[in-house]
Regions:
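Residues within well-ordered alpha-helices
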Residues: 42, 52, 71, 158-159, ...
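Iron-sulfur-associated redox domains of electron-transfer enzymes in respiratory
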Residues: 1-16, 20-21, 96-251
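Conserved NTP-handling cores and scaffolds of large molecular machines
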Residues: 20-27, 31, 89, 230
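Conserved short loop/turn motifs at secondary-structure junctions
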Residues: 41-43, 70-74, 177-180, 210-212
C-alpha cells in the first residue's frame, strides 16, 4: 500500500487484500512453505565478520551469541550475500557455487565468436526474454542465457570464468523492481569493470541494465546493440584467456 509508495485507493485496497489473504493462509494452516533455494552459512568457514548482515536486502541474516545464521523463512534466495563473503562461507541450496561455475564454463565453451553470456535475474528479467521468444521477436543467437536469482549473485570470479572459457562479452540483466536495486547494480558493475582491467579485459565487454516483464523489446534491442559492440571489438585473445584460467586455478 501507501507504505511502499504513493498509490490510489483502489491499488492500496487490492494490495492490502492480497497481503491479508497470504497472512490468513499462514495463520489458518499454522505452517508455511519455504523455497528450497535459500542461502545457508558454512559454519566452519564463518569468522562472524557480519558483512552478510549488512548486505542482506531483507534482513534474513541473524546474529546470536553462538553463531550467525540465515532465517530460511525470511531469505528470498537472491544470493547477494554469497559472493560478498570474504571467506566463501555462504552458499545457496540447490544452486551452489560449484554448479554455477560449471554452468558458466559449459555455456561459454564451443560455438563461434563473438560469444555473449547474459546473466538474467530468473523471474522478471528471464521472463521478459522468454516473452520476446513467445512474441517472435528474435535476438542474436550468440547470446547465451544463464538464469540467476539476482545479478547480485554474479561476482568478478564468475565474469572471469566466462571470459576464460570463451565469452567475448557479458551482460547482467536485472528485474527493475527487484531486491538488487538499480543504483546498487550500477555500483557493482562499475567496481567489476575496474577489476576486469587488471586481467586485461576491456570494461566495454561488460554491460548491465534492468527491465520489467513487458519490456522485452528493450531486452532484444540491448542484446542487438551489445552484440554489435562486441563484434567490432573482436574476440578476446587466447593468450589472455589462458592467463585468466591460470589465475583462476591458482586461487
Amino acid at each position: 500500500g501507501c507504505a511502499l509508495s504513493p498509490k490510489d485507493v483502489r491499488e492500496t485496497t487490492l494490495e492490502a487484500m492480497a497481503t491479508a489473504s497470504r497472512v490468513a493462509t499462514f495463520v489458518g494452516k499454522g505452517e508455511i512453505s519455504v523455497s528450497p533455494e535459500v542461502a545457508y552459512i558454512i559454519q566452519e568457514k564463518c569468522d562472524r565478520c557480519e558483512i552478510c548482515i549488512k548486505v542482506c536486502p531483507v534482513a534474513a541474516v541473524e546474529k546470536s551469541p553462538e553463531a550467525i545464521t540465515i532465517n530460511p523463512i525470511s531469505c528470498v534466495g537472491c544470493g547477494i550475500c554469497v559472493p560478498r563473503c570474504p571467506r566463501e562461507a555462504i552458499d545457496l541450496k540447490n544452486s551452489t557455487e560449484a554448479q554455477l561455475m560449471a554452468q558458466i564454463r559449459g555455456v561459454s565453451e564451443g560455438g563461434k565468436p563473438p560469444k555473449i553470456i547474459a546473466f538474467l535475474e530468473k523471474e522478471i528479467a528471464y521472463g521478459s526474454a522468454d516473452l520476446a521468444g513467445q512474441s517472435r521477436v528474435s535476438y542474436p543467437s550468440n547470446v547465451r542465457i544463464i538464469g540467476v536469482p539476482s545479478t547480485g549473485r554474479v561476482s568478478l570470479k564468475h565474469l572471469l570464468q566466462a571470459f576464460a572459457y570463451g565469452a567475448d562479452g557479458v551482460v547482467l540483466l536485472e528485474d527493475h523492481g527487484g531486491v538488487f536495486k538499480e543504483e546498487t547494480l550500477r555500483e557493482h558493475v562499475t567496481q567489476m569493470k575496474k577489476e576486469l582491467r587488471e586481467y586485461g579485459v576491456e570494461p566495454l565487454r561488460l554491460m548491465s541494465f534492468s527491465t520489467t516483464l513487458p519490456e522485452y523489446g528493450k531486452v532484444t534491442e540491448t542484446f542487438e546493440t551489445f552484440n554489435s559492440r562486441i563484434s567490432k571489438m573482436g574476440p578476446l585473445s587466447e593468450e589472455n584467456r589462458a592467463k585468466i584460467r591460470e589465475k583462476l586455478q591458482s586461487n
